[in-house]
């Protein structure tokens, strides 16, 4: 940072002294520029006119007048010879330029400044300095990069809109305290503290490394739900929750260019929030966890990899969006969507997930549990082992559907390479709209027109077993179609029935056109028996055709939205039946 640029002449002294007076809450008369024959009586701070560096102890200097002064080889200690003896002063701010930038140094003791600037890894609690800055009315403060570590212990409450800046490098992963040595601006949670400071909201934090020490609490401590906080180029390490509260929600968070590693969970329980260009790597547990009510969040260009369990975990959290980058080698599924949660995922590489979960329902790139909803578009799914060629080949499947019913999977324009055991495993059947993907065939099993195995169907497919005639062999199947309206133009559809004789091992089918109309008080379904096709011949048909195997009749509901198929066995065969309708 450059030095404070001052005008020449007496105005120079006046500006610098006025700035320092307000910053340190001391009298204007207690500050002066160092020079020969200057009386130090009553002075607290000296300014070097050549460098603009600030020297002193913020306590009254000795008496006497200055005859000479010198600075030691470290640049941190000034020796001043006066008519009454020798003064030893320490540099308490880099220059008056850091005063104009509201440096935390300006509120720290000279001993603390010296130690944090010169002792690698030393922890200096600066609660007192931050509180002094807040009390002075400042609304932004600069934490200079230091060899030591700034420590806070939840003593200070940041006023709404209070901002904090630093200069730091972000470690990719961390293992212990030494991982933070020489990282620049590092703020560490005090041992046993519930937070670093109490947030009020609308804060901006820029280029600071935040260390949670022991994975116990969330970094965003507040007395109630906090909102409007921005984090630019920050790092979050060893927190219980990297960005989030220990309990409760945070809203309208904006994180850009941040690194997260070594936390239990990097991000948790956000509302209406965004993360852009962030790296979420090697958390102890989940990368991201959005739970009940943590709705409407977006991740854009974020890398989520090598986390202990799930990469993304959504539970009863709706309206979420993931766009771009990499979701790779997480211990469980890359993305888990459960119990009514919903997420849209586009243009991501989703690969090698389920790293520690082979032969379980977590062994997938995507896991849909219970009534989860996921939309996939333009993504690339692959499997693989660790970067070095070791480890287990995962995932087992690109997609696993498990848990209860009601889940929804919509996928188009993706590339599926298949997991170790296949493309998709359905422990429970999902409502699927899967079209136009590489590797995964088109499947639509919901809505008016459905598709499977290359066949387009109208409504659902119905299955059942038709026992032999001697066993009171009857079966009723229901098929859905769009509701009919009175005086509609008649519509021809086709009923398709396939059957397997489980006793004789024989394959059978029955196809017949149906004419749907509504001219009187109720809709009518007419079977056009002259156009039916059956195999073997005359085994299937309406009663008027005297079939030898199965007698078929059809009826419909009062609005024509359901077609009922009634089957009656006429022989000794036991049949497995599948029926559907299609357009003519």
Swiss-Prot record:
Stated name of the protein: Depolymerase, capsule K25-specific
Species name: Klebsiella phage K64-1 (Bacteriophage K64-1)
Encoding gene, per UniProt annotation: S2-2
GO BP terms in the entry: adhesion receptor-mediated virion attachment to host cell; symbiont entry into host cell via disruption of host cell envelope; symbiont entry into host cell via disruption of host cell glycocalyx
Superkingdom per UniProt: Viruses
Entry GO terms, CC: virus tail
Protein role: Functions as a receptor binding protein (RBP) and probably mediates the attachment to the host capsular exopolysaccharides. Displays a depolymerase activity that specifically degrades the K25-type polysaccharides of Klebsiella pneumoniae capsule.
Compartments where located: Virion
InterPro entries for this protein: Beta_helix (IPR039448), Pectin_lyas_fold (IPR012334), Pectin_lyase_fold/virulence (IPR011050)
Any matching Pfam family: Beta_helix
The keyword Repeat appears for this protein: no
Keywords associated with the record: Degradation of host capsule during virus entry, Degradation of host cell envelope components during virus entry, Host-virus interaction, Viral attachment to host adhesion receptor, Viral attachment to host cell, Viral tail protein, Virion, Virus entry into host cell
SUPFAM superfamilies cross-referenced by the UniProt entry: Pectin lyase-like
Keyword Transferase: no
């Amino acid at each position: 940072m450059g030095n404070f640029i001052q005008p020449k002449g007496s105005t120079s002294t006046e500006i610098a002294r006025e700035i320092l007076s307000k910053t340190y809450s001391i009298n204007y008369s207690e500050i002066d520029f160092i020079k020969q024959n200057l009386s130090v009586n009553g002075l607290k701070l000296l300014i070097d006119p050549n460098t603009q560096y600030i020297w002193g102890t913020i306590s009254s200097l000795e008496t006497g007048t200055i005859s000479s002064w010198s600075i030691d080889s470290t640049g941190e200690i000034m020796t001043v010879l006066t008519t009454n003896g020798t003064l030893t002063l320490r540099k308490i701010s880099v220059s008056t330029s850091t005063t104009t930038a509201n440096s935390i140094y300006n509120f720290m003791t000279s001993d603390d400044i010296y130690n944090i600037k010169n002792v690698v890894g030393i922890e200096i609690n600066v609660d007192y300095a931050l509180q002094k800055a807040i009390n002075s009315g400042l609304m932004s403060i600069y934490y200079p990069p230091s060899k030591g570590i700034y420590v806070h212990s939840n003593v200070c409450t940041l006023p709404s809109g209070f901002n904090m800046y630093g200069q730091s490098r972000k470690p990719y992963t961390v293992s212990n305290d030494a991982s933070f040595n020489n990282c620049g601006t590092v703020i560490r949670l005090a041992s046993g503290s519930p937070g670093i400071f109490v947030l009020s909201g609308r804060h901006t934090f820029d280029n600071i490394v935040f260390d949670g020490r022991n994975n116990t609490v969330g970094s965003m401590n507040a007395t109630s739900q906090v909102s409007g906080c921005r984090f630019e180029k920050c790092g979050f390490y060893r927190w219980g929750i990297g960005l989030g509260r220990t309990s409760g929600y945070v809203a309208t968070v904006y994180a850009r260019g941040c690194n997260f590693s070594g936390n239990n969970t990097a991000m948790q329980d956000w509302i209406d929030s965004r993360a852009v260009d962030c790296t979420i790597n090697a958390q102890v547990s989940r990368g991201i966890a959005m739970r009940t009510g943590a709705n409407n969040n977006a991740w854009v260009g974020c890398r989520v990899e090598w986390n202990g369990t799930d990469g993304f975990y959504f539970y009863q959290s709706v309206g979420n969006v993931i766009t771009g980058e990499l979701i790779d080698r997480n211990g469980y599924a890359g993305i888990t969507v459960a119990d009514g949660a919903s997420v849209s995922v586009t243009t991501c590489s989703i690969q090698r997930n389920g790293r520690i979960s082979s032969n379980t329902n977590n062994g997938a790139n995507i896991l849909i549990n219970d009534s989860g909803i996921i939309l996939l578009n333009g993504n690339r799914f692959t499997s693989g082992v660790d970067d070095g060629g070791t480890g287990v080949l995962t995932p087992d499947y690109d997609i696993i559907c498990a848990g209860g019913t009601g889940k929804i999977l919509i996928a188009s324009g993706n590339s599926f390479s298949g997991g170790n055991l296949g493309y998709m495993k359905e422990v429970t059947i999902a409502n699927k709209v899967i079209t136009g993907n590489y590797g995964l065939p088109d499947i639509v099993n919901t809505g008016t027109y459905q598709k499977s195995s290359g066949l387009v169907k109208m409504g659902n497919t119905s299955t059942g077993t038709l026992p032999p005639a001697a066993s009171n062999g009857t079966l009723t199947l229901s098929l859905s179609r769009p509701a009919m309206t009175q005086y509609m133009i008649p519509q021809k559809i086709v009923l398709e029935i396939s059957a397997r004789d489980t006793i004789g091992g024989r394959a059978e089918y029955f196809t017949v056109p149906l004419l749907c109309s509504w001219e009187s008080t109720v809709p009518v379904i007419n079977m056009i028996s002259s156009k039916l096709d059956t195999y073997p011949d005359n085994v299937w048909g309406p009663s008027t055709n005297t079939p030898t195997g199965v007698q078929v009749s059809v009826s419909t509901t009062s609005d024509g939205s359901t077609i009922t198929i009634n089957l009656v066995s006429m022989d000794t065969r036991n049949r497995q039946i599948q029926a559907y309708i299609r357009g003519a």
